[in-house]
A protein has these predicted regions:
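A generic, lipid-embedded transmembrane alpha helix
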Residues: 1-11, 36-45
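Short gly/ser-rich anion-binding loops that grip negatively charged ligand groups
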Residues: 2, 28, 69-73
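Hydrophobic alpha-helical membrane-insertion segments
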Residues: 2-27, 109-129, 142-144
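P-loop potassium selectivity filter motif centered on the GYG triad
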Residues: 20-61, 128-185
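A conserved hydrophobic secondary-structure block that centers on an alpha-helix together
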Residues: 56-130, 174, 181-185
Length: 185
């Protein structure tokens, strides 16, 4: 199954320049970079050799990175559930159904918590939209480009699944990923 997800991620990352939800015109990753991104997010080490807001499109943030972060967190939870199930019995020949544990941990724990945390982040000012970069004038009168996007959708699973790989290049240090004290908790 992971091979299918890996191929899915590779195809989308390499061709992201032609996919929808790309208002900033980001180009596709090279094969080497897409390979590194897919492998690192599939095994939950989340090594980033790109800046999230400029190296990925909104589409690939949602349908590759966020998907992989759900899968890896649920995989770890399912493995732990199987181990706990086996340890709770005096003798056993099986440790349970991995697929069942995977689906339950995704749909009963990770998804509901991510939705709640995402709603909290939106109320605190974390961006959640599909508009392109904003051009603003600073107090000094200088033009600045501010990245936006579906940040409030990606950050919760990153935090719940103990994944790295932030939406912005500096991860949770970015003021839009962590705008208030409450969102920092």
């Amino acid at each position: 199954v992971n091979l299918i997800w890996f191929v899915w991620g590779m195809v989308l990352l390499v061709s992201q320049g032609y996919l929808p939800l790309n208002p900033d015109g980001n180009i596709g990753q090279t094969c080497h970079q897409a390979f590194n991104t897919c492998i690192s997010f599939m095994v939950n080490c989340n090594l980033q050799h790109y800046s999230g807001e400029s190296g990925l499109t909104y589409f690939t943030q949602l349908f590759v990175i966020m998907l992989f972060q759900f899968i890896t967190a649920a995989t770890g939870m399912a493995a732990m559930a199987g181990i706990m199930n086996a340890l709770s019995k005096k003798t056993t020949k099986t440790i349970g159904n991995f697929w069942d544990y995977l689906v339950l941990s995704s749909t009963r724990i990770l998804l509901p918590l991510s939705l709640v945390v995402g709603c909290i982040l939106i109320t605190q000012g974390t961006p959640m939209g599909f508009d392109g970069k904003m051009e603003v004038t600073t107090l000094e009168g200088v033009e600045q480009t501010i990245s936006q996007g579906p940040t409030a959708a990606v950050v919760p699973i990153k935090q719940l699944g103990t994944n790295g790989g932030g939406y912005f290049g500096v991860n949770s240090s970015h003021p839009l990923e962590n705008p208030t004290y409450l969102s920092n908790m």
